[in-house]
């Protein structure tokens, strides 16, 4: 009679089908959780990339705006001896606004701020740095064809044309703006300027004095791109950007004010 020798440890056995299924279930849960987190990370990365693009667009716009603001009101009449002979001759002295400098219509002089509103600002300055005065406008929907676009116009100032009726040449700087008020203005003493619905321009003595007292401009942009949705929340992506800049040059619109040229 042959004897069969048992091998292996006493009581040793393989996995049961139930144990194998439990192990596979646990492994599936772990792998599923890992892939879920990877998917969330990918969605977040995509969202942040789009937000970064919007932020960079806003940053470029604000940089351009700050460069322009630094040139507001230059060159102005303080830099010239008006008793000397000019070639060509000085512009016809304006008589419509006796509180303003008589030569605000001369294209060699930059008046400074000419109109302010919550979503609109008009001013003059040599923004190219070559001494040629430009008429600059930043305005939400300036062209009338892009409701949520902050647009910029730049044209060379024309002599004997009122600063507020200079031509415009619109270009879009930022799209999809939802800010209720892009611009906020502060006077020389830090007091915030209250803006009426129609804005403030120099066509009245009181408003001209307000413009000649503006020292600081705050800009607040909130951009919501309806075509780029956060894949995690399902909502359009929003990006905000704030900045503040101070005026360095004087105003030709009123005399005796903190920022006046005369």
Please annotate each region the language model reported.
Residues 1, 73-89, 154-158, 185-195, ...:
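Short regulatory "switch" loops immediately downstream of catalytic or recognition motifs
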Residues 2-3, 11-76, 256:
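Aliphatic-rich helix starts adjacent to a transmembrane/signal segment
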Residues 20, 117, 213:
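Exposed loop/turn and edge beta-strand positions of beta-sandwich/beta-sheet ligand-binding modules
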Residues 47, 69-120:
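Short, glycine/small-hydrophobic-rich surface segments
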Residues 59, 70, 147-153, 248:
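Short, cationic motifs built from Arg/Lys/His that form the positively charged side of catalytic pockets
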Residues 101-200, 236:
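Type IV pilin-like appendage domain
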Residues 129, 161-162, 167-168, 172-262:
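Short linear sequence signals and composition-biased patches located at protein termini or domain-edge surfaces
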């Amino acid at each position: 009679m042959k004897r069969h020798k048992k091998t292996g440890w006493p009581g040793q056995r393989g996995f049961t089908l139930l144990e194998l299924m439990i192990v596979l279930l646990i492994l599936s849960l772990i792998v599923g959780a890992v892939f879920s987190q990877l998917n969330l990370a990918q969605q977040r990365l995509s969202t942040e990339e789009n937000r970064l693009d919007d932020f960079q667009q806003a940053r470029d716009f604000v940089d351009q705006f700050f460069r322009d603001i630094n040139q507001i009101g230059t060159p102005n009449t303080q830099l010239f001896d008006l008793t000397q002979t000019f070639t060509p001759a000085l512009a016809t002295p304006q008589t419509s606004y006796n509180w303003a400098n008589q030569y605000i219509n001369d294209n060699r002089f930059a008046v400074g701020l000419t109109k302010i509103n919550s979503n609109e600002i008009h001013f003059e300055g040599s923004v190219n740095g070559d001494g040629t005065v430009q008429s600059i406008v930043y305005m939400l929907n300036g062209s009338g064809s892009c409701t949520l676009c902050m647009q910029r116009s730049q044209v060379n100032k024309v002599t004997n044309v009122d600063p507020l009726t200079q031509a415009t040449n619109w270009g879009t700087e930022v799209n999809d703006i939802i800010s209720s008020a892009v611009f906020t203005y502060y006077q020389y003493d830090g007091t915030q300027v209250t803006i009426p619905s129609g804005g403030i321009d120099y066509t009245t003595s009181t408003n001209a004095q307000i413009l000649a007292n503006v020292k600081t401009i705050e800009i607040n942009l909130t951009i919501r791109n309806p075509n780029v949705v956060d894949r995690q929340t399902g909502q359009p992506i929003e990006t905000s950007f704030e900045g503040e800049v101070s005026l360095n040059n004087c105003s030709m619109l009123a005399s005796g004010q903190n920022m006046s040229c005369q």
